[in-house]
Amino acid sequence: MSGYSSDRDRGRDRGFGAPRFGGSRAGPLSGKKFGNPGEKLVKKKWNLDELPKFEKNFYQEHPDLARRTAQEVETYRRSKEITVRGHNCPKPVLNFYEANFPANVMDVIARQNFTEPTAIQAQGWPVALSGLDMVGVAQTGSGKTLSYLLPAIVHINHQPFLERGDGPICLVLAPTRELAQQVQQVAAEYCRACRLKSTCIYGGAPKGPQIRDLERGVENCIATPGRLIDFLECGKTNLRRTTYLVLDEADRMLDMGFEPQIRKIVDQIRPDRQTLMWSATWPKEVRQLAEDFLKDYIHINIGALELSANHNILQIVDVCHDVEKDEKLIRLMEEIMSEKENKTIVFVETKRRCDELTRKMRRDGWPAMGIHGDKSQQERDWVLNEFKHGKAPILIATDVASRGLDVEDVKFVINYDYPNSSEDYIHRIGRTARSTKTGTAYTFFTPNNIKQVSDLISVLREANQAINPKLLQLVEDRGSGRSRGRGGMKDDRRDRYSAGKRGGFNTFRDRENYDRGYSSLLKRDFGAKTQNGVYSAANYTNGSFGSNFVSAGIQASFRTGNPTGTYQNGYDSTQQYGSNVPNMHNGMNQQAYAYPATAAAPMIGYPMPTGYSQ
């Protein structure tokens, strides 16, 4: 399996405890060849009297900061929307020099042309340098990575040198490979300047180089929980020297099911460590984790205390039906691609939808690429590199990329499928408007998402966004029980999908197998997939064009509003379809990107003006 050293690694870094082979979700088979991650790790019994002492309070208040009055501090915190809870919280630093970082660190900061600390850095640095446990709750793009990395360097510099067989002094746990790599990219420059070694360990990559880094000794280690547990179980590293622990995007790690692994890892670390937890939201599960792992911690919140989105993002919600999404997406992309800054992330719910939408858009000539959890690490790295450098300005992604994907110039986010929670919605749209920049988020919201409508409206109101009246109508329909085709937005899917006859799908996901709403001459138990309005008598396997479409010389015509093309053997054809992009193989290995040959159609309904008069 390309890119993965084992199937077990692949499952672990997605948060699943049971192995893919040899067991089940209920637990391993009786032979116990494979087990749950971390089951070989024994919880350590710590005697603090026997442990070597270490220092963790290095903070010296700058004279300029000492002269600052309590009223001036409070005025600054209000201006930056900083809320602090806890005892003896230090004053925020207003300038980099007030943090008293080493000269090597200040040189790197100067080269990066930073003007002043962000809000979370200003308040977080004094807390972390004081050796206090802390929780930082801040929106994405707020500079939290440096908030814990620079104090980590100071912490490491004050500890004894590593000896042979020692593990890392600083451990950063991250939920995804992408986030771990991005943290490592930031850490590498600062650690190199301070003559410290930093490494990144994650699943989906060869273990050998990662093991060699650990065996040579590294002061700083960024890791995903699954791969770290692998190395702890087989004795390739240990956490005996770890005194500075960071849980980055703790809410995301809990969402991905990593809590058991996190607890196993923390059990291997001495209890008098310094712990910093970072999160974009503050649900009860994260609060419980903080109570279990942190002691007398300082809680720092940036922005509104309730669920909130970045106010620099223009949020536009289009209430529609599922069968309308494809057409609306194409119209929207035609408008976006005419802009000079057009880097766009399209979020979908499932891996299957990601692959299908990527293939469809590339067949139509759009420079799109897809990324999700089942892609090999090599392919994911390549796709992200193409996206970051603008060679493929459209990235179609599942939630694997919704947090931690740090690309500065993403201008647009499109929620093709609305996520399961408003927390995920906020994280998704947070991929744009990084730092102080602006961005736009478009969302397709269907009656099937009605359970999230109230939360979405709350997020929009908090951010002072115009609210589509159709959203308010959905709230009324939900209260009156009319939301599912009995009033309000009429649910016309039955007529669209089955030409007046009930199509026989049992769930919404079955309905998704009909992408455009035209019937097929074939009858399948789960519904043959008829993409883009195909009406064909060709043989289907699993109803998917392009991978399991068996034509045996039969030609099927695509009628979608674009020039009719002829496809044989799925979509692998030299026939040009809508643009000059031949020979599309699984959405990859194209000769060149080409924008649609036809002139961009005028936008309908985007952007929605205030009041939504259309």
UniProtKB/Swiss-Prot annotation:
**Disulfide bridge map:** none
Which subcellular locations apply to this protein? Nucleus; Nucleus, Nucleolus; Cytoplasm
Q: How is it modified after translation?
A: Sumoylated; sumoylation, promoted by PIAS1, promotes interaction with HDAC1 and transcriptional repression activity. Sumoylation also significantly increases stability, and reduces polyubiquitination. Polyubiquitinated, leading to proteasomal degradation.
Modification Phosphotyrosine occurs at: Y297
Q: Where is the Helicase ATP-binding domain?
A: 125-300
Q: Where is this region: Disordered?
A: 1-39, 477-504
Q: Where is this motif: Q motif?
A: 94-122
UniProt cross-link Glycyl lysine isopeptide (Lys-Gly) (interchain with G-Cter in SUMO1), position: K53
Quick one: which residues bind ATP?
F114, T115, E116, Q121, A138, Q139, T140, G141, S142, G143, K144, T145
Instruction: Give the molecular function GO annotations.
Output: ATP binding; ATP hydrolysis activity; mRNA 3'-UTR binding; mRNA binding; nuclear androgen receptor binding; promoter-specific chromatin binding; ribonucleoprotein complex binding; RNA helicase activity
**One GO process term, biological-process aspect:** positive regulation of DNA damage response, signal transduction by p53 class mediator
Q: How is this protein named in the record?
A: Probable ATP-dependent RNA helicase DDX5
Please name the source species: Pan troglodytes (Chimpanzee)
